[in-house]
């Protein structure tokens, strides 16, 4: 069975590892290298980095767009039985979809959270379950027929890092099952009426106010990798805990200072801030930050 794989981040890498163990992967498509960080160091995608580090001898393609005759010819020459897609970052044009069955491993229980950030949105909304859907791709955005899915619980301690890890391994196990039993699967159409969509995360999405502790906690979990959570003045809250979600407090009032951190009240609930990072400075313990600002219990945290 000849497989072409399309994927970019570490979620995709885990799925690719599973394919390499059981199938003939004849080509890998991933996004172009791009500048990363303040110094704008040109960095390869996680999938490419993995293949190079493991000395895997498979052709790697990094087109800026799939809508070209060159890409079509490359895929046609590879003659795949299946094209497996996981967080690739581009929509496949009709011509490619017609080359071979294209199966997408989407990190949500479709039709919920179609789009670019399903894991973050499951956390943002405080969901208690999520999963991976294997979908037969069409020209829409995550609208294809469902081939299979698997479900896991979301723990309150989960964040984007842990959930990405769990779902990538779930997808790694699901993908071979779908490929091996593809001819016997009856695809199920998605119910569009139940669909929801999630956009790419923007930096400004990480800004918070001390209004609802549960909302802050869910943002912290969802944005722990990027963009983080921060106040209007740019102060990043690097590490926090949820204290309680029921009591009413003055917004941003410092309720308690201890070695464990700084408890700050919200209009609903409270959080414990353990460490912060002022703009253009290194991260520090929240208690040390308060000392520098000469803030005490009863003051407003800023």
From Swiss-Prot:
Designated name of the protein: Methionyl-tRNA formyltransferase
PANTHER family, per the entry: METHIONYL-TRNA FORMYLTRANSFERASE (PTHR11138), METHIONYL-TRNA FORMYLTRANSFERASE, MITOCHONDRIAL (PTHR11138:SF5)
SUPFAM superfamilies: FMT C-terminal domain-like, Formyltransferase
This enzyme's EC code(s): 2.1.2.9
UniProt keywords, alphabetically: Protein biosynthesis, Transferase
Function: Attaches a formyl group to the free amino group of methionyl-tRNA(fMet). The formyl group appears to play a dual role in the initiator identity of N-formylmethionyl-tRNA by promoting its recognition by IF2 and preventing the misappropriation of this tRNA by the elongation apparatus.
UniProt KW Transferase keyword: yes
Gene that this sequence comes from: fmt
Residues the record lists as binding (6S)-5,6,7,8-tetrahydrofolate: 108-111
Naturally occurring in which organism (per UniProt): Nitratiruptor sp. (strain SB155-2)
Superkingdom classification of source: Bacteria
Enzyme category, top tier: transferase
InterPro entries reported for this sequence: Fmt (IPR005794), Formyl_trans_C (IPR005793), Formyl_transf_N (IPR002376), Formyl_transf_N_sf (IPR036477), Formyl_transferase-like_C_sf (IPR011034), Met-tRNA-FMT_C (IPR044135), Met-tRNA-FMT_N (IPR041711)
GO cellular component: cytosol
């Amino acid at each position: 069975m000849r497989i072409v794989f399309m994927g970019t981040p570490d979620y995709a890498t885990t799925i690719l590892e599973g394919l390499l163990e059981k199938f003939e992967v004849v080509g890998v498509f991933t996004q172009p290298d791009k500048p990363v960080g303040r110094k704008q160091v040109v960095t390869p995608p996680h999938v490419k980095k993995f293949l190079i580090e493991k000395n895997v001898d498979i052709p790697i393609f990094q087109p800026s767009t799939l809508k070209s005759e060159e890409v079509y010819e490359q895929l046609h020459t590879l003659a795949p039985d299946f094209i497996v897609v996981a967080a690739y970052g581009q929509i496949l044009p009709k011509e490619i979809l017609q080359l071979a069955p294209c199966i997408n491993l989407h990190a949500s229980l479709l039709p919920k959270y179609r789009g670019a950030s399903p894991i973050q949105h499951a956390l943002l909304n405080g969901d208690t379950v999520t999963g991976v859907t294997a979908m037969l791709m069409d020209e829409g955005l995550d609208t294809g027929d469902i081939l299979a899915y698997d479900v896991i619980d979301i723990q309150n301690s989960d964040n984007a890092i842990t959930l990405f890890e769990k779902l990538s391994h779930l997808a790694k196990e699901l993908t071979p099952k779908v490929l091996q039993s593809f001819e016997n699967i009856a695809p199920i159409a998605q119910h569009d009426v139940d669909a929801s969509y999630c956009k790419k995360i923007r930096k400004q999405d990480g800004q918070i106010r001390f209004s609802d502790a549960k909302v802050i906690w869910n943002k912290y979990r969802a944005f722990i990798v990027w963009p983080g959570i921060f106040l209007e003045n740019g102060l990043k809250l690097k590490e926090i805990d949820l204290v309680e979600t029921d009591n009413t407090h003055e917004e941003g009032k410092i309720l308690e200072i201890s070695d464990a951190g700084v408890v700050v009240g919200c209009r609903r609930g409270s959080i414990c801030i353990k460490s912060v990072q002022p703009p253009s400075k290194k991260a520090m313990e929240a208690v040390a930050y308060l000392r520098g600002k000469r803030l005490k219990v009863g003051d407003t945290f800023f």
